[in-house]
């Protein structure tokens, strides 16, 4: 049973996680992959127990009147669980990010410099209601040689407890310490976690923009921000209607609670009269409620859009629509109201598409495809710890590459710096190997 530690015990938990991380980072690829395989097998065997725990969470959340978008994130059905386990297996087969040499340079004869990939150490991950996030993050942490301290949303407490128990039990059968995966269960523990900069190397919050800002303002630990998902789709003057309709419907309705679902549709005025009526019909058949500017209201039946709609992440079957008079106007709107997440253009004009992709300031810019592809699993990362909308790397879906850093190794044979300084100093060769 996972028991939430008292605040005083959290230091002990973090210290033990640090020790587990040091050991984990020293293991070879095969040993870490065996641990990931054991996790996948354990999750598969425990599927009935996991789904039952999730049903308990869902029933309790429904009784409390939880919002529909949050409920949809909380729900872990059999299909989603199987897909998540498949993602764990994919992580097992990904290239090992540890030990990768990205610089190999001879400074002088017998003096060789290497830049080598290594783990960050201990991750603190605070995520929303999605229980599958715990599975994804745990597998990526093991693969990248990191320990992790997890805090899920209170709505998913039982699901997260059972998942952590299953994962720790699986790790106990391998050379990886079960203390590499840890779970916190109370909100009070978050503040103390944010103060454990002597143990925790990176905080990854997954939630609202306000929540991410709170984390950033209350910790000295580096934060990998994952904020709002206000995604846009722009239908250009040269858009193909046969592509525009299915892409728009998919981007809004395939999973409206996802952060990569579109919230605003921008339509060029040259095609608005032709495109909006069939689009509105297709979206209406999926139960989407539409909100439009004055021009949109003249063409289709919709509610009036307000200024607040352009900067709202609905996470629901609601879509705001605005008619624009140019590509430049669409780009300006996205850069003003977007969250730098993922935005797309539908157009047969490659020049317009290239301008859009160059000038839209987002982590993902797409041409003639759904924004729903903004996902670590779909990118071939196996899974993701989140999507970063900040400028500094990693950016976009964060997989293994975002969970490793590097160290410089210098191999010599009695070399000293004095040889290369002052009068008669010896020159470096700086020869890349």
Curated annotation (Swiss-Prot):
Pathway: Amino-acid biosynthesis; L-proline biosynthesis; L-glutamate 5-semialdehyde from L-glutamate: step 2/2. CDD domains: ALDH_F18-19_ProA-GPR. Its main location: cytoplasm. It is found in: Cytoplasm. GO terms for cellular component: cytoplasm. The keyword RNA-binding does not apply. It catalyses: L-glutamate 5-semialdehyde + phosphate + NADP(+) = L-glutamyl 5-phosphate + NADPH + H(+). Keywords: Amino-acid biosynthesis, Cytoplasm, NADP, Oxidoreductase, Proline biosynthesis. Catalyzes the NADPH-dependent reduction of L-glutamate 5-phosphate into L-glutamate 5-semialdehyde and phosphate. The product spontaneously undergoes cyclization to form 1-pyrroline-5-carboxylate. HAMAP family: ProA (MF_00412). Belongs to the gamma-glutamyl phosphate reductase family. This is Gamma-glutamyl phosphate reductase 1.
